[in-house]
Amino acid sequence: MKNLFYLFFTSLIALSCNQKSPEAQTSEAETPSLYIEWYGDNEVANEMVTRGIEHVMNVEFDKAFVLFEAAMQLDSTLFGPHVMLAQFSNANSENQEFHYARAKVLAADKNVNSKLFVSLLDEKNEKGKRQVWGADNHLIWKKMYENEPRGRFMRFWYTFGMAAEEGAEDALLKMLGDFKSEGSNYGPVLNNLGYFYMKNGNMDKAKEYFERYCQIRPNGYNSHDSMGEYYFNNKDYENSLLHYQMALDNYPAASNAKTMIAEIKTLMK
């Protein structure tokens, strides 16, 4: 069993050498930076953080939860996993407050954007939930992005929160082009564009971007979940069911896919 774990972790490290961190390192990486300081000295923990970030950007939060929890256990100095685990915790729970408190302590000597990242959790909503996303935090994401425009994670979530009148469409399309040219994972941007166009009533464009997302992430589950939602909103229940089933096949614990499959089957009776 120990040998199996060793092979698994060494494989993670080897794979990480061929992947860009979602938060880093463009051609300007040698200049002083204000990237969120996600990483520590444990290579395996760092790789788990990187993969956790990727799942967060792809809205695959349950997989991200497992990776951040494991990273935190391997390297107790990391604050970023605590931020995300606080986000994933239930409102007013002991876990939420524990992870928030640990994140503040561990980020105390980090750079300004790392501290701003933790500060996203400072205010609870009316239900007692600490959240890194939402309209109330948009200005903090904007400040983080302005501090370090090369940070892909910060840029992604700042742009995610932009309204149409702020220039969201142009910002998303520019980010898509930049991520592609950098060799970064651009699937999440396709997903956001799909939702942007669907929200604004351009169903043809929405379908185009959701289809592209499925094409570049065929083994993910959120890509098919998004495509399923598109078809569901357009009352094409057969294709919606097909994609929700694909999401469930790719990740049998995908709870939203299970719920939607049951709902669609009821509607199709």
Description of each model-found segment:
Residues 41-70, 74, 115-133, 147, ...:
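Alpha-helical segment of the N-proximal tetratricopeptide repeat
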Residues 42-43, 76, 108-111, 146-150, ...:
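Short coil turns that delineate tetratricopeptide repeat
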Residues 45, 79-80, 113, 149-153, ...:
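Helix-start (N-cap) detector for alpha-helical repeat units in TPR-like alpha-solenoids
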Residues 57, 91, 126, 161-165, ...:
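Register position in tetratricopeptide repeats
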Residues 84, 154-157, 192, 226, ...:
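Canonical tetratricopeptide repeat
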